[in-house]
Amino acid sequence: MKNKVFDIFSEICKVPRPSKHEEQISRWLQDFAVSHGIECVADEAMNVIMRVPATPGYEDHEGVILQAHMDMVCEKNGDVQHDFMRDPIETYIDGEWLKAKGTTLGGDDGIGISMALAAITDSDLPHPAIECLFTVDEETGLTGAMKLQDGMLRSKRLINLDSEDDGQIFIGCAGGIDTLAKMHYEPVSVSEAVCQRSGLCSVSPQGGLLAVKLRVSGLLGGHSGDDINKGRANANQLIVWFLARIWPQTDIQLASINGGNLRNAIAREAEAVLTVPMSYKEQIRIEWNHFVAQMEGVFGEVEKDMRLDLETCDMLDTFIPSDKAYRLVMALCECPHGMIAMSKEMPGLVETSTNLASIKMKEGYIEINTSQRSSIEASKHHLKWAVEQALSLACDEVTHGDGYPGWAPNPNSPLLEVVKKAYTDLFKAEPKVLAIHAGLECGLFLEKYPYLDMVSIGPQMYGVHSPQERLSIPSTERCYNWLCQTLKSL
């Protein structure tokens, strides 16, 4: 596969770049600029800005910013040994798709960087003055965009290269906010756990205890914005639904519960370890089999590789106190997840959603991460309060992140008209103009540079934020040609 964009992307895949750990990729970008004689500055946040002068004949044209983010979501399959802080991403070609071996690919947004770098190092491409803005930590906090200083950017037009849909131009995005909850507790021993009589169970332990592990795996997961309305299962929900189902039937002692990983990814895997009375041994398997059948009926058409496993396991030494464990399960059941409302203005666009992203056992507490999105600011805040109220049923600490603004669509954008015409001239078809239910950095750029005229484009990708991520090779080639045609036309 000989192509300048993919040659650059191949080099980027060798550089570790987890969110909040962009030191190596920031340095790589600066070295790239130096080696090509390109003006380059890096700010305190490690954002990198490259500046390329206009080519002959374009000196009096308004400049443009090409923008992408450095970091990538680091997800891997449970059976894959990969250290994202050290190991390169191993890629392979499957037909017309570029994929990674058991991990996220990092096409989001490594391919955006690659297209921008290919464009500014193409000596045959005529263009106005170009600024390349490469930001850090887009995936877990939009930190780079938030810390971008006033006055760093000179141009009034910006093309964001962080979209994932072929032949589509995005002119707006949702705002978002995170809700984080913690339930602190003092672990108890097996004997203490059994002696704690909460009054919430109907059957007493008899004949000893049976330790079992519940595990959900093989789910699609995906982006908590783009994929939230696709009917995919959330592994965290499946675990707590089953626990809530059997809790009234017997004495349960919950030893551990873990699921999900990143706030902007739908949970693909989750597990819980618990004990039940030995007398409940057969019944829990019956209940599990019924539950599996029900979940296959609900999600089977979408989740083709869903696995729900129950197995006996070794007894753990400590447990969550019974009353707290019960309240935790009920709070998680009450916590909303998924699509909440569709846009009335733009058919097919999710307006409001929330993601029950992760449940993590820490020393002395359980941490729950969620994220809320909406293109309507009031709806975003109403939803964060609903999540807070649900989690407060169990958690003694609930906090919210700073949040980030949405990007209001401007259908009369002059830049939009240029980008649309470039597409039509190349492909003899009309591109779709849409807004996206995901957080792009554009909303934050507008806060600092309210005069910016912006659009977002990108090649076709599926399964982003999951090990199923794949990037269309022909779509990438089309998108790069489209970008080049746009630069010629500006």
Regions found by a protein language model. Give the residues of each.
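Acidic/His- and Gly-rich active-site-bordering loop/insert found
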Residues: 3-97
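A short beta-alpha structural unit
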Residues: 10-14, 273, 307-318, 357, ...
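Active-site metal-coordination/substrate-binding segment of hydrolases
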Residues: 58-134, 138-140, 145-156, 322-325, ...
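Acidic, glycine-rich active-site loops and adjacent beta-strand->loop/helix elements
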Residues: 70-72, 133-141, 162-165, 220, ...
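Midchain, well-structured core segments that form catalytic/ion-binding scaffolds
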Residues: 94-99, 103, 139, 147-372
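His/Asp/Glu-rich mid-to-C-terminal helical/loop segments that flank catalytic regions of hydrolases
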Residues: 232-249, 277-281, 326-333, 341, ...
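Active-site-adjacent substrate-binding region
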Residues: 241-257, 409-452
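Zn-dependent metallopeptidase/amidohydrolase metal-coordination segment
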Residues: 344, 351-364, 429-485
